[in-house]
Amino acid sequence: MSQIKLIVGLANPGAKYEETRHNAGEWLVNELARVFNVTLKEEAKYFGKVAKINTPQGEVRLLVPTTFMNLSGKAVGSLANFYRIKPEEILVAHDELDLLPGVAKIKQGGGHGGHNGLKDIIAALGNSNNFYRVRIGIGHPGHKDLVASYVLGKPSPSDQPLINVAVDEASRCVELLFKEGIVKATNRLNGFKA
């Protein structure tokens, strides 16, 4: 079982997007930064905001790419190459249309499900999809033609608190992962519903 050395929160950059559903991955990394009392700082060579946290498993880097979503692989690839971090040592937090608000799940591998951030990361890691994901449920608008505007919109007043609770629980499960490993963290988070 490899340990996690890099946690990535997928997002689009800028104030215009920070409260949109597509930025749910960033919300998780921001929460981890708050819990570990670190500040994410822009680092141009990694095309993102970066912080280092010390965990029971050793040093872990937090990353929020400052590229647009469809270029997320540039940031992940740069940092992973520099620190020689393998795909299976990476945890990517992202918004998930196929899960309801209030639900978040950890999984390893799989396709990108049309998520442009995941698609670019898979390409940047030499077509490896073997990294872990924290899938943060945002719900589905009901039709594929509505997806683009849906993910770039803000959650409804009823969905936002549910997503927040799921992000908080996901953060606690990442802390559990550092202490007791990915299996325990996965079992706890995958059984959770707000």
Curated annotation (Swiss-Prot):
Coiled coil: none annotated. It catalyses: an N-acyl-L-alpha-aminoacyl-tRNA + H2O = an N-acyl-L-amino acid + a tRNA + H(+). The active site is at 22 (proton acceptor). TRNA binds at residues 17, 68, 70, 116. GO terms for biological process: protein quality control for misfolded or incompletely synthesized proteins; rescue of stalled ribosome. SUPFAM superfamilies: Peptidyl-tRNA hydrolase-like. The record marks 95 as: Stabilizes the basic form of H active site to accept a proton. The keyword rRNA-binding does not apply. Hydrolyzes ribosome-free peptidyl-tRNAs (with 1 or more amino acids incorporated), which drop off the ribosome during protein synthesis, or as a result of ribosome stalling. Catalyzes the release of premature peptidyl moieties from peptidyl-tRNA molecules trapped in stalled 50S ribosomal subunits, and thus maintains levels of free tRNAs and 50S ribosomes. This is Peptidyl-tRNA hydrolase. It comes from Glaesserella parasuis serovar 5 (strain SH0165) (Haemophilus parasuis). The gene is pth.
